[in-house]
């Protein structure tokens, strides 16, 4: 076997291994957070905001901490929804 054949064989092997790894990754992504266990999952969900704070934009009618969202003028004079 010469050098060119060896290089081609290594490239084919790397490609096959890449496809196997891609299949494993796809299975993990389809499961969502099922692959996370215990503390790792808690850290992910702990960082997510519970409510939108005062004077922050509230698009898509998200829940504000105060419980209300009203139209207010921004620095450009445009009306935007903001949490009270």
From Swiss-Prot:
Q: What is its main location?
A: secreted
Tissue note: Expressed by the venom gland.
The protein's UniProt keywords, in alphabetical order, are: Calcium channel impairing toxin, Cleavage on pair of basic residues, Disulfide bond, Ion channel impairing toxin, Knottin, Secreted, Signal, Toxin, Voltage-gated calcium channel impairing toxin
- GO term, biological process aspect, one: defense response
Q: Which GO terms describe its molecular function?
A: calcium channel inhibitor activity; toxin activity
Q: Where is this protein found? A: Secreted
Propeptide-annotated positions?
23-45
Query: From what superkingdom does this record's organism come?
Result: Eukaryota
Query: Which Cys pairs does UniProt list as disulfide-bonded?
Result: 51-65, 58-69, 64-83
Q: Where are the transmembrane segments?
A: none
GO cellular component, as recorded: extracellular region
Q: What does this gene product do?
A: Inhibits insect, but not mammalian, voltage-gated calcium channels (Cav).
Comment on protein domains = The presence of a 'disulfide through disulfide knot' structurally defines this protein as a knottin.
Listed name of the protein: Omega-hexatoxin-Hmo1c
Organism annotation = Hadronyche modesta
Q: What is the lineage of its organism?
A: Eukaryota, Metazoa, Ecdysozoa, Arthropoda, Chelicerata
